Design a protein with these regions (language model features):
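Fe(II)/2-oxoglutarate oxygenase catalytic core
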Residues: 1-201
Length: 202
């Protein structure tokens, strides 16, 4: 899929870049942000509806043929049923742990659901990588990252990343390996390069 844009004009293409939350004038009202749009409404706003089977990998390229995004699809076999298994497992774990819209962990700024983080971060002014602190949800997060279906998802995403963006992947891998060779930090999915994971428990 080719889009009418030049990736060299992206802010991130000019060097180190930090995403901004956006101005209030651009974000709209609370009602605007919570509105659920129909496909026809989005098309009327200028969006393009792309037909996709959800399985076949499709790269999205800029006007010079550079890959800027990928619809990574899914592997053959039982992957679809494993996704459903992971979804049901997360729902049950969240319910058993008392997580929901009215719990102290939610809603989150990304939606009307709690979000739990596990792994490593270097944000919030830390001078070096530190372990994210899930506090009372440690056991829940350990069960989530240990579930076979969740691990399968992480490993497929890791493989897709390495296939479609090999140079960026290699940079991630070098940082990951260096960090874990020097610091005793948790690793969610051994064999992958992802430093952290966010679980949306809605």
């Amino acid at each position: 899929i080719e889009v009418e844009t030049d990736a060299s004009e992206f802010d991130a293409a000019r060097g180190a870049h930090t995403g901004c939350p956006g101005r209030k004038s651009h974000m709209g009202t609370k009602a605007d942000k919570e509105k659920e749009y129909t496909v026809s409404e989005l098309i009327d706003m200028g969006f393009k509806h792309i037909q996709w089977d959800g399985s076949t990998p499709v790269p999205i390229i800029d006007c010079f043929g550079r890959i800027i995004a990928v619809l990574a699809g899914q592997p053959e076999g039982s992957y679809g049923s494993e996704l459903h298994e992971a979804f049901c497992f997360m729902q049950k774990e969240a319910s058993d742990s008392g997580l929901g819209k009215k719990s102290k962990e939610g809603p989150h700024k990304c939606g009307l659901f709690p979000v739990l983080l596990r792994g490593v971060t270097m944000g919030m002014g830390n001078p070096h990588p530190v372990s994210l602190n899930p506090k009372t949800m440690t056991h829940l997060l350990n069960r989530l990252v240990g579930h076979a279906a969740v691990q399968r998802m992480a490993k497929y995403q890791n493989s897709a990343f390495g296939l479609w963006a090999p140079r960026i992947y290699e940079e991630y891998r070098n940082v990951h390996d260096t960090m874990h060779s020097k610091l005793n930090l948790p690793e969610n999915f051994p064999g992958t390069i992802f430093a952290a994971a966010a679980f949306n428990l809605g």
